[in-house]
Amino acid sequence: MTDSLSPEAVEPRLRGRFGRPYEYVASTASTQLLLPPEAPEGALVAADEQTAGRGRLGRRWLAPAGTSLLCSLQLRPAVESERLPELTGVAALACLEAIAALTGLEPVLKFPNDVLVGERKVAGVLAEAREERVVLGIGVNVNVPADELPQEVDRAATSLLVETGRELDRAALLAALLERLERRYDAWLSGAR
């Protein structure tokens, strides 16, 4: 199976406005640093590797190159600032739904930002408010072999490969995630919970 996050692999699968424009980089310190303030809502950057990826509360996000879905999405929600923390849960639920749809697994949400399979973390979400925008970072352990899961958290982390026994197409997962996230985001903007 060819597993790529290249524009050629991702863009034909996009159905909505999220992921447009789409930028891919092979390696970066963190995708959270790559979206400029002037980027439009829906702009997305994805990478095969993050050398300084981080999660909520400054925790490190570690993943071998080419095995995970690592991306950041620009949002410009016109809502009260008090509602912005809700975006973390909106994105985590969309991630959970995409994983379930593509794998048949039954992931659960560990409030506010982690997606678990069993008792082990498979994905995380980080929402950072910056001026008039929110940069939403999402990391999913997709094709990480069991022996390459980070040693310091090997009892707490898993991957979709470990849980399903098969490699998954990261571009398909990204497209499924963006479709669900756009739908949930629009409902959230309109006041639905």
Segments predicted by a language model, with ranges:
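N-terminal lobe of the biotin/lipoate ligase/transferase fold
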Residues: 1-101, 186
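Long, positively charged amphipathic alpha-helical accessory segments at protein N-termini or as interdomain linkers
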Residues: 2, 81-106, 117-193
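Residues at or immediately flanking beta-strands
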Residues: 21, 106-108
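Short loop/edge segments at beta-strand edges and connector loops
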Residues: 26, 109-111
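Short beta-strand-initiation
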Residues: 32, 56, 110, 120-122
